[in-house]
Amino acid sequence: MMEKRAIIKSLRINYVVSFVAALVVLLAFELGFIEKGLLAKTVSSTTLYVMQVATVLLTVSLIPLAIKGFTSSLEKAKGQPEADILKLFCKRSLQRIFLLFIVVVFSEFVYYALGYEGALYCGVLGYGFMIYCFPTEMVLDQYLADNKE
């Protein structure tokens, strides 16, 4: 069984790597390593529309899934041994980070490569929720305390 501190440390490393990777994509477009509007001229209007809708749908579906899915899965695990709760917390936290990473990177890509301004708002939402989901010992302790009740 991993200790609580080791779990939090591992989750924080994954969180920081995901956040930095999303920032690298952002900087690649901002600094001109990848051309802005790269696909805007080459894709059809139908493809452009599908990408715009996909951006909004990913944001609207994955952010609540990352937030509510995390808490509901841990609520359902009440009464389990502490080792199982720790494993579930680690697994769900990684899934949460990954889902938000998908939202952020896809939104950045659609904003810069296609020029869809709505993707900017989706990306900002994704970054905001990524900051909200920073793994802390306090949250883990709260779930462990709730499990003991």
Task: Report each predicted region and the residues it spans.
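Cytosolic-side membrane-entry/anchor segment at the start of a transmembrane helix
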Residues: M1-V24, P81-A83, K148
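Alpha-helical transmembrane segments of multi-pass membrane proteins
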Residues: A22-F33, A66-I67, I131
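Membrane-interface helix termini and inter-helical loops of multi-pass transporters
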Residues: F33-S45
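Alpha-helical transmembrane segments
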Residues: S45-L62
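Membrane-helix interface/capping segments
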Residues: I63-K87
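Short, amphipathic, aromatic/basic-enriched membrane-interface segments that mark the entry/exit
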Residues: I85-R96
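Alpha-helical transmembrane segments and their membrane-interface junctions
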Residues: L100-C122
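Alpha-helical transmembrane segments and their immediate juxtamembrane interface regions
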Residues: C122-E149
